[in-house]
């Protein structure tokens, strides 16, 4: 069943790690605008399924997978995170993907920096353009404000509470302009203990987003 009513369809997904079956014919259909939760005990294969959806290297370096993935009605092969991001898929991982010595803005805008021309640009072209920190700060602050996070984007990530780091990961995905599907691999596990009220408010905000 290939239907553009569905943003993602995963059919008969199978995955083994070194001969050990992890996924055995999993099907997942998500309509546009829906919110789904995958429930299961540790080792059930939830993260593996999400890694397949986001094209993580660990999947393809261990023999790939079997089955079909359809995104917005089109059969596709998501062979890398870049492919996933180009389709409009974002993912917040269990493990932090932030650079501690960078500011919040630098982490949110990493590999998506905004450039502006300067006096050398007409002669040297795009390679002479400089980073537009003002615009990047403004856009990053909007993402933080959307989550109700009271932080300044110029702050360094290093030393922030664990819960804040997870919010920054979420803000990074929200900031992507072509975002069509957002995947969370247990991102609130560390936040529930440390920041229950903020976590609940953020989840409500994301459900409206």
Per-segment meaning from a language model:
Residues 1-209:
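Glycine-rich phosphate-binding loops of nucleotide-dependent enzymes
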């Amino acid at each position: 069943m290939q239907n553009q009513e569905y943003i993602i369809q995963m059919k008969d997904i199978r995955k083994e790690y070194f001969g050990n079956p992890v996924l055995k014919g999993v099907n997942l259909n998500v309509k546009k605008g829906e919110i789904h939760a995958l429930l299961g005990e540790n080792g059930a294969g939830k993260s593996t399924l999400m890694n397949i959806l986001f094209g993580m290297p660990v999947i393809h370096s261990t023999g790939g997978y079997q089955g079909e993935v359809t995104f917005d009605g089109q059969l596709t092969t998501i062979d890398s995170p870049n492919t996933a991001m180009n389709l409009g898929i974002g993912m917040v991982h269990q493990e932090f993907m932030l650079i501690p010595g960078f500011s919040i803005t630098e982490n949110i805008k990493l590999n998506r920096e905004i450039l502006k021309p300067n006096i050398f640009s007409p002669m040297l072209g795009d390679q002479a353009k400089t980073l537009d920190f003002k615009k990047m700060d403004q856009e990053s602050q909007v993402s933080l404000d959307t989550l109700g996070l009271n932080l300044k984007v110029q702050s360094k990530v290093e030393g922030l509470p664990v819960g804040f780091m997870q919010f920054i990961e979420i803000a990074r995905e929200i900031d992507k302009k072509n975002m069509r599907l957002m995947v969370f691999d247990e991102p609130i596990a560390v936040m529930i203990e440390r920041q229950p009220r903020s976590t609940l408010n953020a989840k409500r905000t994301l459900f409206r987003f």
